[in-house]
Amino acid sequence: MTNSLTAFTSPDLSSSSGSACELNGRYSSRAPKGVRAAEEFTRTRLSKSFFMRDFLFSEIAAIEGLSNLPGDPKLAIAAGRGLCENLLEPLQATFGRLAIRSAYRSPEVNGFGCSHRLSCASNEKNRARHTWDRRDKNGHMGALTTVVVPWLVDRMAEGITWQAMAWWIHDNLPYSELQFFPKLLAFNIGWHEAPKRTIYSFIAPRGFLTKPGFPNHDGDHSHLYRGFPGPATQ
């Protein structure tokens, strides 16, 4: 292994770092009401390159006229910062611009997607995953987004595989879970306070590439992603 695995940073919910989404020096724990409040919230900077607005678009919400704003902005911001600072920034610094696909989903949006078979897991399963402002059953926060890495898409014809990207992330980033999809080799990447360290594929043959307890989980996997760049210094 490259031995460059970054220790994850858990954001401080009590922080008041000058973000646009603050209420009396603290992030609001209530959903933004009205256009101006929503605009202020979406200006919240999550990391060097990412703002909250980058993660709020939803085709389901747009087509069905549903709200995709978090009910607990304070928690959503903290979880989003964990995702951006620990995973998305180092991934983008190494491979270039990321395309964000499905990211935050409100319970209303996710519940609609689940009940209408629109590729959404249940609201319970998406706590601390796509639903950033809901802790999981153990009280942990987390955040997940679907990304496309154009660097990877451009190299598919050269024989670069999703497994190579998966093992690079496994060796170099403090992710919680990865799930890979056939179209554009998009994948879910999740940050979590108690990382699971699992990699799953919806690309045939479907199943786990690795998870704790698998014989391939530990050790050096660099031979599986030869030619990949080393982690960039941010």
Q: Where in this protein do the model-derived segments appear?
A:
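Cell-envelope/glycan interface and biosynthesis
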Residues: E59-H170
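N-terminal, Lys/Arg- and Ser/Thr-rich interaction peptides
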Residues: T2-S4, T9-D12, S16-P73
